[in-house]
């Protein structure tokens, strides 16, 4: 996790890397995604956002507790719990999902697709509404999530979108 002042945004930003999650009511949260997925949760009533960044859905190996955030099967429940521990109400949670790029050649394992489908299915099981999904299978992206309005700015190599 890296905290810095972003001169373009004129804001304090916390950058998370694979395996990390962060919850805030003040700081913009950012990450860079390829095949990984970031789940961004919001409780607008409590002005709270959280973001995780996971690499794979699961592992067939034993995972040490400090590595669990790298896997969606752990990362999504951990993010939900972190939101609740910071004052969010489960009934207020809403989600936006990003990432899931497939860089591999045709016919290869589609890690990005598996990651994105897992996020959607898991949030549906938790009954958390998904307000936006950005799973373009061909583009990496950098995302910035804002706590005051749940706006997420996505920067691609060829442009920018707001979700």
UniProtKB/Swiss-Prot annotation:
EC no.? 3.5.1.44
User: Which UniProt key words apply to this protein?
Assistant: Chemotaxis, Hydrolase
Q: Which GO terms describe its molecular function?
A: protein-glutamine glutaminase activity
Q: What class of enzyme is it?
A: hydrolase
Q: Which GO terms describe its biological process?
A: chemotaxis
Read off the Gene3D superfamilies from this record.
Answer: 3.30.1330.200
Highest taxon of source: Bacteria
Say if the entry is tagged with keyword Hydrolase.
yes
Coiled-coil spans in chain = none
Catalysed reactions listed for this entry: L-glutaminyl-[protein] + H2O = L-glutamyl-[protein] + NH4(+)
As for what it does, the entry says:
Probably deamidates glutamine residues to glutamate on methyl-accepting chemotaxis receptors (MCPs), playing an important role in chemotaxis.
UniProt lists the family membership as follows: Belongs to the CheD family.
Q: Which PANTHER family match?
A: CHEMORECEPTOR GLUTAMINE DEAMIDASE CHED-RELATED (PTHR35147:SF2)
* Protein name from the UniProt record: Probable chemoreceptor glutamine deamidase CheD
| Taxonomic lineage | Bacteria, Pseudomonadati, Spirochaetota, Spirochaetia, Spirochaetales
- Which gene specifies this protein's sequence? cheD
């Amino acid at each position: 996790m890296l905290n810095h002042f972003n001169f373009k945004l004129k804001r304090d930003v916390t950058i998370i890397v694979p395996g990390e999650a962060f919850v805030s009511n003040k700081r913009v949260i950012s990450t860079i995604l390829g095949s990984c997925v970031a789940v961004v949760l919001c409780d607008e009533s409590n002005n709270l956002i959280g973001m995780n960044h996971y690499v794979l859905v699961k592992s067939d190996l034993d995972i040490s507790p400090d590595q669990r955030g790298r896997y969606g099967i752990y990362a999504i429940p951990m993010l939900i719990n972190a939101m609740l521990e910071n004052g969010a109400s489960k009934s207020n949670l809403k989600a936006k999902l990003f990432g899931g790029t497939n860089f591999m050649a045709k016919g290869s394992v589609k890690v990005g697709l598996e990651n994105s489908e897992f996020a959607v299915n898991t949030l549906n099981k938790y009954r958390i509404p998904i307000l936006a999904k950005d799973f373009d299978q061909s583009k990496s992206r950098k995302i910035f999530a804002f706590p005051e309005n749940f706006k997420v700015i996505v920067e691609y190599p060829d442009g920018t979108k707001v979700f």
